[in-house]
Swiss-Prot record:
Subunit structure comment from the entry: Part of the 50S ribosomal subunit.
GO MF annotation terms: structural constituent of ribosome
Assigned protein family: Belongs to the bacterial ribosomal protein bL31 family. Type B subfamily.
GO biological process: translation
Pfam families, A to Z: Ribosomal_L31
Domain of life: Bacteria
This protein's record includes keyword Ribonucleoprotein: yes
Key words, A-Z: Ribonucleoprotein, Ribosomal protein
NCBIfam families the record matches: L31, PRK01678.1
Organism: Pseudomonas fluorescens (strain SBW25)
Name assigned to this protein: Large ribosomal subunit protein bL31B
Gene: rpmE2
InterPro entries xrefs: Ribosomal_bL28/bL31-like_sf, Ribosomal_bL31, Ribosomal_bL31_B, Ribosomal_bL31_sf
Amino acid sequence: MKAGIHPDYRTVLFHDTAADVFFLIGSTADSDRTHVHSDGNTYPYIPLDVSSASHPIYTGQQRKTQVEGRIAGFNKRFASFGSGAKKAEE
């Protein structure tokens, strides 16, 4: 390997802002920001919008939302079916 062409591999603190969860991960990502972690050490800090702590695929929320949406759509579509609501209004 050539010297001086590879990025520095170091421990970086990633923060999932949606779930307020911190991850210490080895990375080559650059950051000008630093943050003091709960272990008392200062690490380069990179905020994240989504991680495994907040993404619906990993939390299981996506399925629940889809099911609720389908049920609500079904109930809305067939709310008056069989109840005679349209005949009573006419």
